[in-house]
Regions:
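Long, ordered, helix-rich scaffold segments
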Residues: 1-145
C-alpha cells in the first residue's frame, strides 16, 4: 500500500538525513516490495562507509532474495563497493534470468574496471545462460567467441 511506501520513505529520510543509524530504522516485517522501495529511494551516490553500514545492519549482500540482491548489487556496482564482488560473481553464475543479469552487466560496462570484471564473470557464466540472455549480454559487452 502507499502508506507502507510512505513509511519506507520516512526511514530512508531518517537515515540519509543522519537522524538515525541503519540499525535503528523501523524495518521489522517489511515485505520484498518494501525492501525494493527502500533500495530504490536511496541516493544514487553513497560512500563505502554508508554501504557498509546498510550491509551490516540488513545483511543485503547475503540476502536469499534474488530481487533484493539484484537491487543491492546495482547500488554496489554504481558506487564501486568492493565487498560485494564475490557475491556479484556467485549471483551472475547462479541466476540466469535476463531481467536480473542484464542490468548488472550494463552497470559494470560503464567503467573500464567494471567491464573487465564483467568479461571475467561472463566468460564463466555465459554457457549457462539462455541464448536470448547471452545475446543481450553479448551486445552490452561486445562479446565475441
Amino acid at each position: 500500500s502507499s502508506d507502507a511506501f510512505t513509511l519506507v520513505e520516512e526511514q530512508v529520510a531518517y537515515w540519509v538525513g543522519g537522524d538515525r543509524i541503519a540499525t535503528s530504522l523501523e524495518v521489522a516485517g517489511w515485505t520484498t516490495f518494501e525492501w525494493l522501495h527502500f533500495l530504490a529511494q536511496l541516493p544514487q551516490s553513497l560512500t563505502t562507509s554508508q554501504l557498509a553500514e546498510l550491509d551490516q545492519a540488513f545483511e543485503l549482500t547475503s540476502s536469499g532474495n534474488a530481487e533484493i540482491v539484484h537491487q543491492w548489487l546495482l547500488i554496489a556496482i554504481r558506487n564501486d563497493y568492493l565487498p560485494t564482488r564475490d557475491r556479484l560473481e556467485r549471483y551472475l553464475l547462479a541466476i540466469g534470468r535476463r531481467k536480473l543479469v542484464l542490468p548488472l552487466y550494463q552497470a559494470m560496462a560503464e567503467t573500464a574496471d567494471g567491464r573487465s570484471l564483467a568479461m571475467n564473470i561472463y566468460r564463466q557464466a555465459r554457457p549457462g545462460y539462455h541464448p536470448i540472455t547471452a545475446n543481450s549480454v553479448d551486445a552490452v559487452l561486445g562479446w565475441s567467441e
